[in-house]
């Protein structure tokens, strides 16, 4: 134990990598440098500061500006901004850009804590909307356009609508309907799309927030796509929130010394999607189909929208992201897992995402997940 306590963090990380664990968590690249070769190149020799020929994130006009323009084209936004402080920084910037101190904001109760931090920092007055609960899996359901429309009638002073879609569990809300309800009152919509950077890139996936009329959306590249942890995009669409204000707030809520390693991984991710996105997403969808087929016969595991649950109707849920695999274990399955040496929490229901689905993972990983032969974890299942 003393020897373990004395090991440096990088040594522990290296040992974890060499142990060959199957990643059931973020980041979306799954340590797959073969898929995204640029990630393997991002070491200390490429870690620089703002040199003229490498552009400046806070005043972009060169390679960074070009990378963000390419991202805007891919996601269909008026403007997209690289975020080195993750979706957290993007949410803070977006909320600040769309509001003034003392404004009333309509907020889904299951928003990320960054939204609550923004409310505190910006001195906002929140009006909370409670999503329905899907009883079978115990998950927060979808926010509905009717809820939003009624809340805007009841609170005519609201200046912004904020909600997550998809959620961590893959629950998608009717963003087109919500935007229609909000825009009828002249109110902009911010979608926390942290878990949805992949949406809209394949017909099997729901459309993204920008395609449905959202004014602002924040998407974590590192959660679902091959980019380094802490990388995200802030998308701006529509004309209800001025672009200069969005740009200014991204500068306020990001480091003045943004990492070129993080920015290079974002630029590389965008280029990968441009060049190989269609084939990669087709392969991803094919493996999700294989996953569905592989779990059909499982008796002690239910997966939201997959396997025996495919095509099921869940009250309170508008749609599901098929890339998400929230799972329900009965108590008996947890006991079986513990006997096999798995470190499962001592609770009846364990919902988590099998994140080998996050990005086009290799076939052997898909088989390991579908057959239930994952490695034991050292801690609780995420």
Please describe what each predicted stretch is.
Residues 30, 223, 268-270, 322-324, ...:
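Glycine-rich beta-alpha junction loops
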Residues 279-354, 358, 368, 372-382:
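Conserved small-domain helix->loop->beta segment predominantly found in fold-type I
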Residues 5-14, 18, 38, 74-77, ...:
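Conserved PLP-enzyme active-site core in the AAT-like
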Residues 1-62:
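N-terminal "arm"/small-domain region of PLP-dependent enzymes with the aminotransferase-like
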Residues 41-87, 110-111:
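Conserved N-terminal alpha-helix of the aminotransferase class I/II PLP-enzyme fold
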Residues 71, 268, 364, 382:
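Active-site or pore-adjacent capping/gating segments
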């Amino acid at each position: 134990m003393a020897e373990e306590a004395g090991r440096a963090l990088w040594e522990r990380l290296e040992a974890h990598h060499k142990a060959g664990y199957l990643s059931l968590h973020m980041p979306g690249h799954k340590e797959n440098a073969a898929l995204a070769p640029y990630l393997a190149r991002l070491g200390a020799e490429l870690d620089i500061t703002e040199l003229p020929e490498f552009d400046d994130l806070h005043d972009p006009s060169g390679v960074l500006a070009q990378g963000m323009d390419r991202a805007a084209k891919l996601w269909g936004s008026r403007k997209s901004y690289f975020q080195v402080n993750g979706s957290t920084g993007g949410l803070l910037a977006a909320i600040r850009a769309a509001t003034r101190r003392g404004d009333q904001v309509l907020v889904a109760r299951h928003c990320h804590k960054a939204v609550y931090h923004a409310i505190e920092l910006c001195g906002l007055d929140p009006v909370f909307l409670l999503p329905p609960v899907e009883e079978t899996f115990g998950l927060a359901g979808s926010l509905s356009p009717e809820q939003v429309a009624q809340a805007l009638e009841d609170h005519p002073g609201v200046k912004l609508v904020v909600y997550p879609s998809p959620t961590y569990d893959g629950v998608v809300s009717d963003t087109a309907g919500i935007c229609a309800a909000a825009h009828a009152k002249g109110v902009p919509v911010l979608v926390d799309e942290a878990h949805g950077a992949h949406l809209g890139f394949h017909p099997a996936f729901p459309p993204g927030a920008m395609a449905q009329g959202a004014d602002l959306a924040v998407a974590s590249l590192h959660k679902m796509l091959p980019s380094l942890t802490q990388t995200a995009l802030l998308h701006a669409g529509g004309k209800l929130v001025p672009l200069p204000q969005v740009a200014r707030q991204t500068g306020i809520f990001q480091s003045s010394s943004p990492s070129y390693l993080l920015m290079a991984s974002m630029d590389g991710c965008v280029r990968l999607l441009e060049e190989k996105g269609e084939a990669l997403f087709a392969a991803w969808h094919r493996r999700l189909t294989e996953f569905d087929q592989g779990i059909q016969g499982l008796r002690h595991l239910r997966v939201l929208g997959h396997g025996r649950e495919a095509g099921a109707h869940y009250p309170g849920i508008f749609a599901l992201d098929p890339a998400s695999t929230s799972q329900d274990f009965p108590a008996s399955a947890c006991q079986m897992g513990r006997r096999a040496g798995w470190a499962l929490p001592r609770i009846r229901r364990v919902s988590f995402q099998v994140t080998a689905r996050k990005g086009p993972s290799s076939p052997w990983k898909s088989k390991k997940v579908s057959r239930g032969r994952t490695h034991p974890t050292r801690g609780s299942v995420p």
